[in-house]
Design a protein with these regions (language model features):
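Short His-Asn-centered micro-motif
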Residues: 18-20, 49-50, 180
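Structured catalytic cores of enzymes that bind and process phosphorylated ligands/cofactors
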Residues: 1, 15, 169-170
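N-terminal cationic-hydrophobic initiation segments that often serve targeting/anchoring roles
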Residues: 8, 59-62, 124
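Dinucleotide-binding Rossmann-like beta1-alpha1 core, especially the glycine-rich loop
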Residues: 35-111
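Glycine-rich FAD pyrophosphate-binding loop
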Residues: 8-34
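Active-site/ligand-binding neighborhood in enzyme catalytic cores
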Residues: 76-78, 86-183
Length: 183
């Protein structure tokens, strides 16, 4: 859609976009339900970037509602921050680590692997087997319908692990939702 907009508005070309689905927007499609609630049928799509140019370009087409996504995972009877951070580890294991000690702790539980090929490998090599089982294995199986050992490492490699208390899912400078939805 960006290419179509640029062709039309910069080069004066006529553009036709054909969407395979019966609505515009692809997976970012959203709609208001009968109660006025904005629904994302394909799951939430949170805009995030570190690029001021991209943010300014898109700001021509929408006003923004600032939004920083935070996730709590239900683990062992507790609601814990996800991505895994300092508070996650301290609360889950009853520790009192500092941010300086956190990386050493992660290194001590991480599995040393010669090759990281699967999503399981990617996670256990960063946070160890226990955290993998508590946070990643079941969720990844539910989301993808496959065991993480059957998925490429890139599937879970993008999920960060933080050594500080930052509990935002994304750390990008610009995080928001279009004020009136994507579509």
């Amino acid at each position: 859609s960006v290419l179509a907009e640029r062709l039309a508005n910069v080069l004066g070309q006529r553009v036709l976009i054909v969407d395979k689905r019966p609505h515009i927007g692809g997976n970012a499609y959203d709609r208001y339900d009968d109660h006025g609630v904005l629904v994302h049928p394909y799951g939430p799509h949170i805009f995030h970037t570190n690029s001021e140019d991209i943010f300014e370009y898109l700001s021509q087409f929408t006003d923004w509602r600032p939004y920083q996504h935070r996730v709590l995972a239900s683990v062992d009877g507790q609601l814990l921050p996800m991505p895994i951070n300092l508070d996650t580890i301290n609360r889950l294991y009853g520790l009192n680590l500092t941010s300086f000690e956190m990386q050493d702790w992660l290194d001590s539980v991480a599995e040393k692997l010669d090759r990281v090929e699967t999503s399981e490998d990617a996670v256990v090599s960063k946070v160890g087997r226990d955290l993998y089982n508590k946070f990643f294995r079941g969720y990844t199986r539910k989301q993808w319908g496959l065991d993480p050992s059957e998925l490429d490492a890139s599937v879970t490699a993008r999920v960060p692990t933080r050594t500080n208390r930052d509990d935002r899912y994304f750390a990008d400078t610009y995080q928001a939702l279009p004020k009136h939805g994507y579509t």
